């Protein structure tokens, strides 16, 4: 890599970081983007089943639970088999998962995900047999069945193998039919609960004020930092859909504490708009020490009584980049970026600088390393 290329990449990374950190007016979002109404949520369903029709890529005999499942299934159909003679190479035991919305009614269809449970190498071309889908209460809420759709393939021979994506997980769009609805009488509620995704008092109170302004009274109140209770106005009792539609689209401007998030594995740094730094002097330089061993070999002449002698020789070179001492007083993020650019800091250098600023008490933000 040439010097010009290194400089260009460093400049491009710092320019991108500067653009991301530019101060900008806070943007309004809808309430439904930062909160959810209590009770209006999906319910997870899970089931155990068999996928058949695999071309020799199914489970091996070591997957004893697959053989037991085959024996039980055939026994229910009135077919007696010797389990010692069953070879499940065309069958795979799978776990089937899906999420059922609270609004789902009998006859509704759900997309399902099918994942191999045993040692099958591929589910390509398989068909899921009828599988009961149960909730956490042990009741059956849906039945799943159908051919799998995979987003990859796998092929191998004696000396080579080709694979794209994962072939042991597949999906069946609309593969489950709802047989039982979740008991939930939506329109009979006289009180609603709003769960905030943003843990911030200012944002929660802003939501309360917006709700009360829209409903024309003190119907909403904050229970805690992340919960808002809403008393249903008399005009909407028994018909909550119009009320919910109007409330969830109200605009608010979320607030959040100053935070800097650092991903050391990738060198990614995300700085919030509220981050400030006190007046501080920053200098950042790299000290590079290279130790190289060059042993010297003394070889005597042929047929001489001398012995070969190896003399160790170590060369040590130290090189340190000269960086300027920069005084930064970060009233804004742009000043922080400009100051770091002036000392030639790369995004990975920024991680070390931010850690040091936090230790010195000059960074007024929460520093989170992931």
Curated annotation (Swiss-Prot):
<comment type="function">
    <text>Assembles around the rod to form the L-ring and probably protects the motor/basal body from shearing forces during rotation.</text>
</comment>
<dbReference type="GO" id="GO:0030288">
    <property type="term" value="C:outer membrane-bounded periplasmic space"/>
</dbReference>
<dbReference type="GO" id="GO:0071973">
    <property type="term" value="P:bacterial-type flagellum-dependent cell motility"/>
</dbReference>
<comment type="similarity">
    <text>Belongs to the FlgI family.</text>
</comment>
<keyword id="KW-0975">Bacterial flagellum</keyword>
<dbReference type="Pfam" id="PF02119">
    <property type="entry name" value="FlgI"/>
</dbReference>
<protein>
    <recommendedName>
        <fullName>Flagellar P-ring protein</fullName>
    </recommendedName>
</protein>
<feature type="signal peptide">
    <location>
        <begin position="1"/>
        <end position="28"/>
    </location>
</feature>
<keyword id="KW-0732">Signal</keyword>
<dbReference type="GO" id="GO:0009428">
    <property type="term" value="C:bacterial-type flagellum basal body, distal rod, P ring"/>
</dbReference>
<comment type="subunit">
    <text>The basal body constitutes a major portion of the flagellar organelle and consists of four rings (L,P,S, and M) mounted on a central rod.</text>
</comment>
<dbReference type="GO" id="GO:0005198">
    <property type="term" value="F:structural molecule activity"/>
</dbReference>
<dbReference type="InterPro" id="IPR001782">
    <property type="entry name" value="Flag_FlgI"/>
</dbReference>
<keyword id="KW-0574">Periplasm</keyword>
């Amino acid at each position: 890599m040439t010097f010009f290329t290194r400089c260009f990449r460093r400049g491009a990374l710092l320019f991108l970081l500067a653009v991301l950190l530019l101060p900008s007016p806070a943007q309004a979002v809808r309430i439904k983007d930062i909160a959810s109404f209590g009770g209006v949520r999906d319910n997870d369903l899970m089931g155990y089943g068999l996928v058949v029709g695999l071309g020799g890529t199914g489970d091996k005999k070591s997957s004893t639970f697959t053989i037991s499942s085959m024996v039980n299934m055939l026994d229910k159909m009135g077919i007696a088999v010797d389990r010692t003679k069953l070879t499940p190479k065309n069958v795979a035991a799978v776990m089937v998962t899906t999420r059922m919305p609270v609004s789902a009614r009998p006859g509704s269809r759900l997309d399902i995900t099918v994942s191999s449970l045993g040692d099958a190498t591929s589910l390509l071309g398989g068909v899921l047999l009828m599988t009961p889908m149960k909730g956490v209460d042990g009741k059956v809420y849906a039945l799943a069945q159908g051919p799998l759709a995979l987003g990859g393939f796998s092929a191998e021979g004696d000396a080579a193998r080709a694979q794209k994506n994962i072939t042991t997980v597949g999906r069946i769009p609309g593969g489950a039919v709802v047989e039982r609805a979740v008991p939930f009488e939506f329109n009979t509620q006289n009180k609603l609960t709003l769960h905030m995704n943003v843990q911030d008092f200012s944002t929660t109170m802003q939501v309360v004020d917006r709700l009360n302004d829209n409903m024309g009274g003190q119907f909403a109140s904050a229970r805690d930092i992340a919960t808002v209770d809403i008393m249903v106005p008399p005009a909407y009792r028994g018909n909550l859909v119009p009320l919910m539609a109007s409330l969830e689209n109200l605009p608010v401007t979320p607030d959040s504490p100053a935070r800097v998030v650092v991903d050391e594995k990738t060198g990614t740094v995300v700085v919030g708009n509220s981050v400030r730094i006190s007046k501080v002097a920053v200098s950042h330089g790299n000290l590079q020490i290279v130790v190289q061993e060059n042993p010297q070999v003394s070889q005597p002449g042929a047929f001489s009584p001398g012995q070969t002698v190896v003399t160790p020789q170590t060369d040590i070179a130290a090189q340190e980049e000269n960086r300027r001492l920069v005084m930064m007083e970060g009233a804004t993020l742009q000043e922080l970026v400009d100051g770091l650019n002036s000392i030639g800091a790369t995004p990975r250098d920024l991680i070390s600088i931010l850690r040091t600023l936090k230790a010195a008490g000059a960074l007024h933000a929460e520093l989170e390393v992931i």
